[in-house]
Structures are given as C-alpha cells and as structure tokens.
C-alpha cells in the first residue's frame, strides 16, 4: 500500500468519524428547547425520537441535516478515492463505516449517540442508486402501512445490502464496498436491539410521518 493510500484511508476514517459525530438532534434540542434529546422519549438522539418528543416543526431539519452531513462526506471521499485509486464505492464505504461509528459513539457527546439509519440510507444512494432506491422504497411502503420505523429501516437497509451483493454477482461492483456496507447495516440492526425486543412483544410504538404525536416513543 502506498503512502497516499494510507493517508487517504486515515483521512476518511478520522474526518468521517468527527464530522458524523456532530448530531443535529442534540444540537437543535439544546438550542431550541433547552433540553438534551437523550433525556427525552426513548433517549435516542435521532430523527424519530426528536419528532415524537418535540413534534415535526424542527424534526425535518434534523432529518435533512443528517442526510446533508453524510452526503458531503460520501461525495468528498468518493471523489478522492476515485481520483487517487479509481474506486468511488470503496471511498464511500470506508467513509460510511467510520461515519456510523462517529454517529453511534461521538467524542463530542460522551460517546452517546444514535443508531445510524440515516447514515446507512444516505450511503446506500452514494454506493449505487439502485440500492438506495430499493431501500428507500421498502422503507416508505412499510412506514405508510405498518408504521413501524425500526422495522422499516432495518428491512430497507438489509435489502439495500442485498442489492449491492447482487450487483457484485452480476456486474463489476466490488466486494469490499458491499461487505463494508453490510457491516454498517449489521451494526445498525444491533443498535436496534431494544426495538427488536419490542417488535417481538408487539409493544413497539407506531411512527407517523405526518402529524405531531408527542408520546414517549420507543426509538
């Protein structure tokens, strides 16, 4: 491995971890409501709990900022890896792995972060639009029917990973980005362990895209 490769991988790891650790849900809950989202509802500092705890007025800013944060990282390192190594997808996948770690264990907030579904969702689109499209479509259908955010995100992202492996089998898509994204999805699912228990017991709270339910949600 050349020195430029080492620098590139190190930069992707460090920058993605630090930038992804900046959590819009925590920042906005403190700035607007003078509360830490981690003390509200389920305690998860993410879009779902923010919307349940404070309503939808600012929740969509959390959603868009989380996506924008990932998009900037994945675009930057996709372009850098393509320029120096000719590997767009590898750059995106490496960035995604450390973005997941930064989102889940942020150094800025005592290593208490979120579950990372928006990191996975954004990465899926940058890895291959077909993976992003399938994952987003499945998530949307499940949200509009069963209204279980945790189930929708896990199923959607698992299918996105499946699409990447299918592309690996049928096209020149690399095995490494497919494997790294699959690790991200597995990590995200493990972060949903409490939700999985509630799903099995039939006690998982519903999530409504529209409307402002403010109960103590489960995500």
Predicted regions and their residues:
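Alpha-helical transmembrane segments of multi-pass membrane proteins
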Residues: 16-20, 99-103, 140-143, 164, ...
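Short, non-helical or kinked segments that cap or interrupt transmembrane helices
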Residues: 36-46, 107-121, 148-156
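Multi-pass membrane catalytic core of lipid/isoprenoid biosynthesis enzymes
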Residues: 52-78, 95
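Cytosolic, membrane-interface loops and tails of multi-pass inner-membrane proteins
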Residues: 26-59, 113, 197-219
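Helix-coil boundary and interhelical linker segments in multi-pass alpha-helical membrane proteins
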Residues: 1-11, 74-94, 125-131, 166-180
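N-terminal signal-anchor transmembrane alpha helix
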Residues: 7-32
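Interfacial segments of multi-pass membrane proteins
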Residues: 51-56, 77-80, 98, 116-146, ...
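Loop-to-transmembrane alpha-helix initiation sites
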Residues: 133-135, 149-157, 172-182
